[in-house]
UniProtKB/Swiss-Prot annotation:
Belongs to the ATPase epsilon chain family. The gene is atpC. It comes from Salmonella arizonae (strain ATCC BAA-731 / CDC346-86 / RSK2980). This is ATP synthase epsilon chain. Keywords: ATP synthesis, Cell inner membrane, Cell membrane, CF(1), Hydrogen ion transport, Ion transport, Membrane, Transport. Pfam families: ATP-synt_DE, ATP-synt_DE_N.
């Protein structure tokens, strides 16, 4: 039997996941993080993107996170997300439209602030599309 730890993924709206997992993958402020059982204690910001959850027995779940905080303690990991949406609940058409609008905004941006905001929106749309794609593959 694989080693596991307890994971809680919570957004401002609801608890998205609570259970035993073998590992997770998430994008922290310093890059990609893989959290396995026995990981050293850690507190870090999460960038917009996805969390890949490998549950007990190897089943995978993908959740889009708009950002938040990751806390790793012995035996338990907590993700406090600004917004969290399960892959199957994301709307592909809306994500594609958001991506298109962000790309247009980047092309027509005037100034660093406009460009930075449009780039952030583009990154969020691309992350949502990636979560949708991986969720479809996992089903």
């Amino acid at each position: 039997m694989a080693m596991t730890y307890h994971l809680d993924v919570v957004s401002a709206e609801q608890q998205m996941f609570s259970g035993l997992v073998e590992k997770i993958q998430v994008t922290g402020s310093e890059g990609e993080l893989g959290i396995y059982p026995g990981h050293a204690p850690l507190l870090t910001a999460i960038k917009p993107g996805m969390i890949r959850i490998v549950k007990q027995h190897g089943h995978e779940e993908f959740i889009y996170l708009s950002g938040g905080i990751l806390e790793v303690q012995p035996g338990t990991v907590t993700v406090l997300a600004d917004t969290a949406i399960r892959g199957q609940d994301l709307d592909e058409a809306r994500a594609l439209e958001a991506k298109r609008k962000a790309e247009e905004h980047i092309k027509s941006s005037h100034g660093d602030v406009d460009y930075a905001q449009a780039s952030a929106e583009l990154a969020k749309a691309i992350a949502k599309l990636r979560v949708i794609e991986l969720t479809k593959k996992a089903m």
